[in-house]
Amino acid sequence: PDGMPPSEAMEALCESAAGAGGHAYQSYVGLPEVRKAFADWYARWYGVTLDPAKEIQPLVGSKEAILLISLAFLDKGDKVLVPDPGYPTYSSASKLVEAEILTYDLCEDKGWWPDFDALEEMDLSGVKIMWTNYPNMPTGAAASEELYAKLVDFGRRHGIMICNDNPYSFILNDDPLSILAQPGAKDCCLELNSLSKAHNMAGWRIGMVAADADVISEILKVKSQMDSGMFKPLQLAAVQALSQDPEWFAELNAEYRRRRVL
């Protein structure tokens, strides 16, 4: 993203940074205001109800969650399903914790979706995590209710945690979807999200993970040993960014559509 963030976010950042109390250590779990803003955002755009106190963890960008999740839920020798093609960090983080990587192909003739028949034929013993990323990078393939329902069913039947990386859901898309909107998804799924793409705030490093409270608790055990909380002015800026009206996304996507034609 090379556009400007929402003006309200920049104003909130500057106001908080100039005031007293904005430069101290912050809580690992994030401000109540930012957790509520993420919960409201999910309810408004994805139709997903989340407990802001227990089912949301703000992050220094969603990328850090890939390593946090790997450290929290993988032991040496555990297996991880990683898409090919896919975001390299899924494999890199798995290697750091000495997990065994099992790649699954995303093919054009399947719409760049997983081939569930092929997955069922794999030896899935010892598989703890499956990384998914829709809308997909690098293929651009979109998600659908059908795809997410299949992923939830696959994860529940095989005892695999489906980790859906969802930072592109607003880009060139008027109907953002979340895997957590599927019935029973919290039993086996978590989702990463971010302000980087949808709000032109990539350098600000503001993201989140949403999941069942027990999953969030395990992630927090690792995160609390890796940083000392997010800068308060950034969190207050995120609250403003997350409250943007549909016009913000319409203008953002109009610009991307204009560039795509060129």
Task: Locate the predicted segments by residue.
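N-terminal small-domain helix-loop-helix segment of the aminotransferase-like
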Residues: 1-61, 68, 241-244
